[in-house]
């Protein structure tokens, strides 16, 4: 019976690995390493190394007029949100389809976030 469970386990793992999620994976402006995540060479989705990765992640930080971007695979989903404190704005987005964390996805999300922020300020301020 244990042999049967072992076979099923490996079949499930191999099946999941062969259909792994593909996310854009790059970062900008950390230490001496700088990549432009908006360039075509970094915008091609790559298969996530961790078979548990079910989400793609985009993290942005705006500080002193500079934008820092991270795009990676993620194991869990985080509610899309932006936080602003001490003149630093950080935004987090997750999604579930191949390549959904590309530069075009971020531009759409940033536009939606900006519109919601303006509507909030008009309504509640």
Swiss-Prot record:
InterPro entries hit by this protein: Sleep_regulator (IPR050975), Snake_toxin-like_sf (IPR045860)
Gene Ontology MF: a single term: toxin activity
GO-annotated cellular components: extracellular region
PANTHER family, A to Z: ATILLA, ISOFORM B-RELATED-RELATED
Annotated keywords: Disulfide bond, Secreted, Signal, Toxin
Leftover remarks: The scoloptoxin-05 family has remarkable similarities with the three-finger toxin family commonly found in snakes.
Protein name: U-scoloptoxin(05)-Sm1a
PTM (free text): Contains 4 disulfide bonds.
Family label: Belongs to the scoloptoxin-05 family.
Subcellular location: Secreted
Signal sequence annotation: 1-20
Tissue expression summary: Expressed by the venom gland.
Matches recorded under CDD domains: TFP_LU_ECD_Bou (cd23590)
């Amino acid at each position: 019976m244990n042999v049967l469970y072992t076979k099923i386990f490996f079949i499930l793992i191999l099946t999941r690995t062969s259909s792994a999620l593909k996310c854009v994976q790059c970062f900008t402006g950390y230490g001496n390493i700088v990549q432009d995540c908006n360039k075509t060479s970094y915008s091609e989705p790559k298969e996530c190394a961790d078979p548990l990765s079910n989400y793609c992640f985009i993290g942005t930080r705006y500080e002193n007029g500079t934008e820092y971007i991270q795009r990676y695979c993620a194991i869990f989903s985080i509610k899309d949100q932006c936080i602003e404190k001490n003149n630093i704005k950080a935004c987090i987005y997750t999604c579930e389809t191949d390549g959904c964390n590309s530069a075009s996805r971020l531009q759409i999300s940033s536009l939606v976030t900006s519109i919601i922020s303006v509507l909030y300020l008009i309504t509640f301020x």
